[in-house]
Each structure stands twice: as C-alpha cells, then as structure tokens.
Amino acid sequence: MWVKLRDSGYTRTIQGLYHVLQRLGIYEKAPSKKKESEPSEWITGKYPGDKVQVDVKYVPKKCMSPDLQEKGERFYQYTAIDEYTRIRYTWFTNEHSTYMSSEFVKRLVKYYPFKIKTIQTDNGFKFTNRLSLQAFLKNKKTMFESTLEKLGIDYKVIKPHTPKQNGRVERSHKKDQERFYYKKVFYSLEDLRNRGKTWRKEYNNFPMRPLG
C-alpha cells in the first residue's frame, strides 16, 4: 500500500502511514509474540536467614602457582550469601563434593549470627541427586541434603540452567573475579584461605544499597 501511495505522490514515511491507519481503525497492530521477561532474580528473603543462596566457584587456574599447576591441583570457593542482609560467607577447598558441601554448611551455621531457615542451590551433584533419575526414584539423599535435614534447614533448588535465580551469589562471584582473583597467585590452599578470609571481611564491609 505504502509503495503505491508513494508512487502517487504520498510523502509520509511508512511509519507515519501506519500511525494514520491505526487512528482510523483500519490497521491493528499485531500482538507481540515476545514473552514477558522473567525477573532477573528471585529474591524472597524477608528477614535474616529466611533464604541463603549457596554456590561453588572454580578458583581460576591462572591464579595457581606454577608448582600447584604442575601437580594438577585445583581449588574451589564455596559461597553463601543471605538474601536479606547480604552477609556473605566463603570457604576454600581442594575438592567440590557432597561431603565438602555438607562440611561447608556446618561451618556456615556457626558463622551466621542468625538461624538459617532455607538454603537454595543449583542442581549440581555436589548438592543434590535430583537430576539423577535412578537416585531420585530411590529417594536417595546426598550427604549435603542429609546434613540440612539434621540441622533443620529447608532445602530449595533453582530451575535447571537458570543461574539468575541464584543471582545474588552469582553476582558476588563476578566481584570476586574483578577484585580478588585479578592478578593474584596462590601458593597453597592455606595461602588462599588466609587471603580469602581477609577478602571476605572487605566484601562484607562494602557499602550496600538499602535493604528492601
């Protein structure tokens, strides 16, 4: 239509023509097929300890000393962050497993000055067997899940492949990468733990946005 009108001397743009047709009720804009975007994160913690996000970060290989790299050593950072207070706890290990995850939780409950009601993680096997059909059908709990049960802590997992549901802890790991791991070299697990403890204190003292 616009091409024919233009050939007849019509001077408006195609967008202008559509606006005129819409006002006259001749052209109805097709409804958008784009789905409403999901929230960037699911923050539901209403009070200290209501929900704590937990995740594991691989310590960058380039941060390991040449000697550690030659030995094939790998280090991991366990991280917990309370959704309401944003208080964060970290612990560094040389393996990530359901055993280490349960050990991390035991340390976490001693660190926080408040009782933890719910812990939320991804679906990794270091936390849960929910993506293992055989284990799930047998209702076989991991050591991590059993530890949470013994401690009276509710357990929640995010949707598979949806890390933004654990957005607060994910973003904290980006800050680790930019401000802690950048241009650092660690010579042992003890070295990493000592410097990581100092960084944890600095992180928890960063100015935060008002709660709410």
Model-predicted segments: where are they?
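RNase H-like DDE/DDD metal-dependent nuclease/strand-transfer catalytic core used by mobile genetic elements
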Residues: 53-77, 85-197, 201
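Charged, gly/pro-enriched flexible loop segments at helix/strand junctions
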Residues: 15, 197-212
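Short, polar/charged, Gly/Pro-enriched helix-capping and turn/loop motifs at alpha-helix termini
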Residues: 31, 115, 119, 206-210
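Generic structural signal for secondary-structure transition and capping sites
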Residues: 26, 153, 181, 205-208
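Short, hydrophobic secondary-structure boundary micro-motifs
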Residues: 29-30, 158, 211-212
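Basic, flexible linker segments flanking DNA-binding modules
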Residues: 2-61, 123-125, 132-133, 139-145
